[in-house]
């Protein structure tokens, strides 16, 4: 299997195995294993083999009780980050339970529109408890403050998430652009 370029043409670059990717990243970066919860027993064996358990962020949208039952034996070694859809009726309660039971390092928060008051409230209530992570890949994940908005007006995109919603982690498809913006604002070395 080969990687494709922006024109959907196969390149000479081979798609690495998870083990190869873990070894390449070892000691350099945090690794977001999105959707790995379904296979985490097998993934964990690779993490131990490669010595990368402390670099892993495992995310999921299951309730705290289920996370503790299913992944409890791993939670001292890997970072578990809950994904909470703030447009759901029980979102605030889910967050409160996670903070009380698991004290997560961060939450990935999702919401479709700025009319939802919860993102602003959480900027204050999670301060000092957990970091806030927003995903800017699509306009439906961070109230429209996505990568595309940020290209046109970075203060309305990334800046809004940082300044108004207390975001400290941004998942983006435009890392160089985001880093440039953060450096211009004195928020990154």
List the predicted regions and their residue ranges:
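Metal-dependent phosphodiesterase/phospholipase catalytic core, i.e.
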Residues: 1-88, 101-105, 109-112, 128, ...
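C-terminal active-site rim and adjoining tail of enzyme catalytic domains
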Residues: 10-11, 83, 88-189
């Amino acid at each position: 299997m080969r990687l494709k370029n922006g024109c959907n043409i196969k390149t000479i670059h081979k798609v690495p195995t998870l083990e190869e990717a873990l070894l390449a990243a070892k000691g350099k970066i945090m690794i977001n294993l999105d959707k790995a919860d379904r296979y985490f027993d097998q993934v964990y064996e690779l993490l131990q083999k490669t010595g990368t358990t402390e670099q892993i962020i495992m995310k999921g949208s299951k309730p705290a009780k289920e996370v503790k039952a299913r992944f409890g034996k791993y939670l001292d070694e890997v970072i578990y980050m809950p994904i909470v859809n703030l447009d759901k009726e029980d979102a605030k309660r889910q967050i409160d339970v996670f903070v009380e039971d698991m004290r997560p390092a961060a939450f990935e928060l999702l919401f479709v529109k700025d009319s939802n008051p919860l993102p602003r409230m959480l900027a204050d209530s999670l301060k000092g408890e957990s970091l806030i992570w927003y995903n800017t890949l699509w306009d439906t994940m961070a109230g429209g403050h996505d990568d595309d908005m940020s290209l046109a007006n970075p203060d309305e995109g990334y800046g809004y998430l940082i300044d108004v919603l207390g975001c400290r982690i941004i998942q983006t498809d435009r890392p160089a652009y985001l880093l440039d913006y953060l450096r211009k604002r004195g928020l990154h070395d």
